[in-house]
Amino acid sequence: MSKTKDQRTAKTLERTWDTLNHLLFISSCLYKLNLKSIAQITLSILAMIISTSLIIAAIIFIASANHKVTLTTAIIQDATSQIKNTTPTYLTQNPQLGISFSNLSETTSQPTTTPAPTTPSAESTPQSTTVKTKNTTTTQIQPSKPTTKQRQNKPPNKPNNDFHFEVFNFVPCSICSNNPTCWAICKRIPNKKPGKKTTTKPTKKPTIKTTKKDLKPQTTKPKEVLTTKPTEKPTINTTRTNIRTTLLTTNTTGNPEYTSQKETLHSTSPEGNPSPSQVYTTSEYPSQPPSPSNTTN
């Protein structure tokens, strides 16, 4: 009955919780709308009431859960105390096992057993025996022929120092007590197992290829001197004419006289050497010889 009541209360609390959550959501949505002041006030009051009721419901729910926990713990404690007070007797009917009645505590009274009827088929069928203690009755069902499994004989644990028999092929000195021949042959072994030797392989050096150089002396060729030939200029025969004009001088008598005209012609030979100048003197009037005063060199 108590379980059904607890379930009902839990369901009612869940329903109230859900309804209050829905109401709070609806009131918050309505409050966002621009309503009149009276409606907003009523919605705010309703939201406050719903929130307080939610808090109260949560407290009730937590309290009921704690009550359930305390009830279960009390039931467990009662059961353990009853188990401690009761001392069941272990009954066996097989005389081969050599087990007799044994009471675990001296405080309990002697158990009353009801003997089972002896029939020829009693050995094959299981028999039930009832044992009465202070206020509790326990029934025990025991088979007539218990199955016994053969236990596997485990090998004895080897001592820690016996590892050398498997590893080494010689006689350890721990065996020799007073035998001199044994002491002559045996070898002392450390207590700890020998660790693996770390072998470091030598790193191969990189092979450097060497090319044999020619032992013949290198013949150095002399550098060729670049000779620049002068470019031959074309020979151009140029004639320079130095014409000196004679100034017309008028005599006091009024007869004009022409002075001699000198022409110098300079010609260049193909080798570039200038030729001697030739001077030509002419006179306009052959009848009159040129006077030294009028001629100009």
UniProtKB/Swiss-Prot annotation:
Biased composition range(s): Polar residues: 140-150, 254-285
Region (Disordered): 101-161, 190-297
Extracellular side: 67-297
Keywords (A to Z) from UniProt: Disulfide bond, Glycoprotein, Host cell membrane, Host membrane, Host-virus interaction, Membrane, Secreted, Transmembrane, Transmembrane helix, Viral attachment to host cell, Viral immunoevasion, Virion, Virus entry into host cell
Transmembrane annotation, as ranges: 38-66
Residue ranges, compositional bias (Pro residues): 287-297
Cytoplasmic compartment segments: 1-37
Glycosylation sites: 70, 72, 80, 86-87, 92, 100, 103, 105, 113, 119, 135, 137-139, 144, 147, 199, 203, 219, 231, 235, 237, 251, 253, 269, 275, 282-283, 287, 294
Signal peptide: none
InterPro entries given in the database record: G_prot
Region ranges (Binding to host heparan sulfate): 187-198
Low complexity composition bias: residue spans: 105-139, 235-253
Alphabetical GO biological process terms: symbiont entry into host cell; virion attachment to host cell
Domain of life: Viruses
Ranges annotated as biased composition (Basic residues): 190-207
Biased composition (Basic and acidic residues): 211-232
GO CC annotations on file: extracellular region; host cell plasma membrane; membrane; virion membrane
Cysteines joined through disulfide linkages: C173-C186, C176-C182
UniProt site (Cleavage): A65, N66
Family: Belongs to the pneumoviruses glycoprotein G family.
Protein name: Major surface glycoprotein G
Source organism of this protein record: Human respiratory syncytial virus A (strain rsb6256)
Name of the gene this protein is made from: G
